[in-house]
Curated annotation (Swiss-Prot):
Its main location: cytoplasm. Keywords: Cytoplasm. PANTHER family: REGULATORY PROTEIN RECX FAMILY PROTEIN. InterPro entries: RecX_HTH_1st (IPR053926), RecX_HTH_2nd (IPR053924), Regulatory_RecX (IPR003783), WH-like_DNA-bd_sf (IPR036388). It is found in: Cytoplasm. Modulates RecA activity. GO terms for biological process: regulation of DNA repair. This is Regulatory protein RecX. Belongs to the RecX family. One of its GO terms (cellular component) is cytoplasm. Pfam families: RecX_HTH1, RecX_HTH2. The lineage of its organism: Bacteria, Bacillati, Bacillota, Bacilli, Lactobacillales.
Length: 240
């Protein structure tokens, strides 16, 4: 049996030092102090001390987890990875994840829903890209499939139109055919399916400007003529 002979507060708020039989033994958090009703004069068995130390590791993990998610929402995998960096045992990490979930601070389904909704409001990403990003955050495929399937096609179309209009503004100095090609490629890279891409382009309905198109073709021809300067005139004309 061992007796707690002194408890002192650390400079760090919510942390305490436990002294047993006149000697410093271990630190505890306020949560552990309260849970075990630790007080001067309390007699502890070796088993109880082991339990307290184990609980303290879990409490420390919970504190790290709470601090991590206080800045922004996180997935279970992100919190797990953060705790693993502290070399916490796997069973402790699982206890922390369970506790945070029970407290309502961790909810992967809600995270996926809000992440998708936020991107759909002002974003320009399609379902494939969003799915990839969320899978990297550790969300399960079946969960993502359900969340993405719940989004109406009109919402994806709106996002594709926003992305398409932005892309066209960036390439308005290019020839019409080149604009369309770059537009299709850009929408594919953002994760939209073929049907949504075709509908988005039809909705945007980009039109060629004959006068501007003529000027662009002349500029491109002049550029190619300069680039083919090493060839003879006849071959140069053929290549241009």
């Amino acid at each position: 049996m061992s007796e707690i002979t002194k408890i002192t507060a650390q400079k760090r708020r919510g942390r305490y030092n436990i002294f047993i039989d006149g000697t410093y033994a271990f630190p505890v958090s306020e949560t552990t102090l309260v849970d075990y009703r630790l007080a001067k004069g309390m007699v502890l068995t070796a088993e109880t001390i082991a339990q307290i130390k184990s609980s303290e590791v879990t409490a420390m993990g919970l504190e790290i987890g709470l601090t991590y998610i206080s800045h922004q929402s996180r997935t279970s995998k992100e919190v797990s990875d953060r705790l693993a960096k502290e070399d916490l045992p796997a069973d402790v990490i699982q206890k922390v994840l369970t506790r945070l979930t029970d407290l309502g601070f961790l909810d992967d389904a809600d995270y996926a829903h809000r992440y998708i909704e936020e991107h759909l409001k002002m974003g320009e990403l399609g379902p494939r890209t969003l799915q990839h990003k969320l899978q990297q955050k550790g969300l399960k495929p079946d969960l993502l499939a359900n969340e993405l399937a719940a989004i109406p096609t009109t919402a994806w179309l709106d996002a594709a139109v926003r992305a398409g209009q932005k892309n066209l503004r960036h390439h308005q100095h290019r020839a019409y055919k080149d604009q369309l090609q770059r537009l299709r490629v850009a929408l594919m890279q953002k994760g939209f399916d073929d049907t949504t891409i075709q509908t988005a382009i039809a909705t945007i309905d980009p039109q060629p400007d004959p006068e501007a198109e003529s000027d662009l073709l002349k500029l491109e021809a002049a550029k190619q003529w300069r680039l083919k300067a090493k060839y003879g005139d006849r071959e140069r004309k053929q290549k241009v």
